[in-house]
UniProtKB/Swiss-Prot annotation:
InterPro entries: Acetalactate_synth_ssu (IPR004789), Acetolactate_synth/TF_NikR_C (IPR027271), Acetolactate_synth_ssu_C (IPR019455), ACT-like_dom_sf (IPR045865), ACT_dom (IPR002912), AHAS_ACT (IPR039557), AHAS_small-like_ACT (IPR054480)
Cystine residue pairs: none
Native organism taxonomy: Eukaryota, Viridiplantae, Streptophyta, Embryophyta, Tracheophyta
Name of this protein: Acetolactate synthase small subunit 2, chloroplastic
Pathway: Amino-acid biosynthesis; L-isoleucine biosynthesis; L-isoleucine from 2-oxobutanoate: step 1/4; Amino-acid biosynthesis; L-valine biosynthesis; L-valine from pyruvate: step 1/4
Swiss-Prot/TrEMBL GO biological process terms: isoleucine biosynthetic process; L-leucine metabolic process; L-valine biosynthetic process; regulation of catalytic activity; valine metabolic process
């Protein structure tokens, strides 16, 4: 009670002093204890209101700073990485994504004797992905890294799908195959193996329609892409093709083929560098970026060395590709081909790789890989009958005078034209290595601007027919 009286008297004195100083012209009144308590409660409420408003403003400011902007949205990016091939380069590039927690959705690797092209699909924001691109540029032998998602491009991927097919459902499956422009590559009494190419949306649509029949296995390549050429722009590839532009032959008739090739590859002829495969290379050998004979799988030699095809089923988690390729490279094995894509079960991915070695060494490698935690299944299908396919996108320099010839060659190899401009034609073709090599060799005379190729995907043939045993022998009449 004494404390309350003291506080009241002090408060009254302060109010009286303020009124005298302000000169209101009327005597100050001494408030009673009830009025003082009301004033104190009112000030507390005003202070609480001010604090609440300040907290609200701070919360709004914080929310505005935390709220993501349009450029911070997570989106799917298609990255092209062109490198000089060396031992362990796949593991090093996969490690850059694994250390930053990125999960690679698909990967397509076009390997050559001394160079390689990676087409990688990942999810991430623009800002963080830019940091990953900068880290990739710092790696040794990385020539160029490009995000193709920012410009118009044509993209394709390849899928082999094996599903149950009894006589009662086979007609409906064939109807769906015809709608999606797919192909039957193997058939048996109870199953069918289908090959289809297209964009990822087409793959998902076909898989959804075939799920009711029972999907047994799926092998998908990663997505590959090439930049679309704009109609009406000048031809930047004319020095690559004398056949495509015959009116230029007379102007440069005194130049030898080596001189014209050197002029084009040194960049004096307006060579393009906008695609994901580059037509020039600053080396003295003057070889195209992806040669026709890249990754050629040779038959078994006298020492027992041959190429082995491995099919791995792994968990779809960040870093699993780095784990697999690291286990292979640490043991001194070279990867000739690599294709990574979603498997038939959700949460799993299938890796198809080609590794040269003897049967004994590959068996040891398989036993070592089986010890990995994220590996669900591994199968060496080299000695089994299997259907293998690869996908290639090839951009050829061809104006109106040479376009008909290029399309005739494409028809022989059952290739499809998927993009046409004033000075180029982009073709899509699927098949084995020998078919790819033969087509690329035939088109070199017209000038190959860009090439993108996937690795090999393979599925075991349920029919048991191995076409390799028929080569070199005449078929029965």
């Amino acid at each position: 009670m004494a404390a309350t009286t003291t506080a009241t008297s002090l408060f009254s004195s302060r109010l009286h002093f303020q009124n005298q100083n302000q000169g209101y012209g009327f005597p100050a009144k001494t408030p009673n204890s009830l009025q003082v308590n009301q004033i104190i409660d009112g000030r507390k409420m005003r202070n609480a209101t001010v604090l609440s408003a300040a907290s609200t403003d701070k919360a709004i400011t914080t929310a505005q700073s935390v709220a993501p902007t349009a450029c911070d949205r997570v989106r799917r990016h298609t990255i092209s990485v062109f490198v000089g091939d060396e031992s362990g380069i796949i593991n090093r590039i996969a490690g850059v994504f694994a250390r930053r927690g990125y999960n690679i959705e698909s990967l397509a690797v076009g390997l050559n004797e001394d160079k390689a092209l990676f087409t990688i699909v990942v999810l991430g924001t623009d800002k963080v992905l830019q940091q990953v691109v900068e880290q990739l540029n710092k790696l040794v032998n990385v020539i160029k890294v490009e995000d193709l998602s920012k410009e118009p491009h044509v993209e394709r991927e390849l899928m082999l799908i094996k599903l149950n097919a009894d006589p009662s459902t086979r007609s409906e499956i064939m109807w769906l195959v015809d709608i999606f422009r797919a192909k039957i590559v193997d058939t048996s009494e109870q199953s069918l193996t289908i090959e289809v190419t297209g964009d990822p949306g087409k793959m998902v649509a076909l898989t959804t329609n075939l799920e009711k029949f029972g999907i047994k296995e799926i092998a998908r390549t990663g997505k590959i892409a090439l930049r679309r050429e704009k109609m009406g722009e000048t031809a930047p590839f004319w020095r690559f093709s004398a056949a495509s532009y015959p009116h230029l032959v007379k102007e440069s008739s005194h130049e030898t083929v080596a001189e014209k090739t050197k002029l084009a590859l040194t960049g004096n002829g307006n060579a393009s560098s906008g695609g994901d495969v580059y037509p020039v290379e600053p080396y003295n050998d003057f070889k195209p970026v992806l040669d026709a004979h890249w990754g050629m799988v040779y038959d078994e030699d006298s020492s027992g060395l041959r190429s082995h095809t491995l099919s791995l089923l792994v968990a779809n988690v960040p870093g699993v590709l780095n784990l697999i390729t690291g286990a292979i490279s640490r043991r001194g094995y070279n990867i000739q081909s690599l294709a990574v894509g979603p498997a038939e079960k959700e949460g799993l991915s299938r890796i198809t790789t080609v590794i040269p070695g003897t049967d004994e060494n590959i068996d040891k490698l398989v036993r070592q890989l089986q010890k990995l935690i994220d590996l669900q299944e591994i199968q060496n299908i080299t000695h089994m009958p299997f259907a293998e396919r690869e996908l290639m996108l090839i951009k050829v320099a061809a104006d109106t005078s040479a376009r008909r010839d290029v399309l005739d060659i494409a028809q022989v190899f059952r290739a499809k034209a998927i993009d046409v401009s004033d000075h180029t034609i982009t073709l899509e073709v699927t098949g084995d290595l020998r078919k790819m090599s033969a087509l690329q060799t035939q088109l070199e005379a017209y000038g190959i601007c860009e090439v993108a190729r996937t690795g090999r995907v393979a599925l075991v043939r349920e029919s048991g027919v191995d076409s390799t045993y028929l080569r070199g022998y005449s078929l029965p009449l």
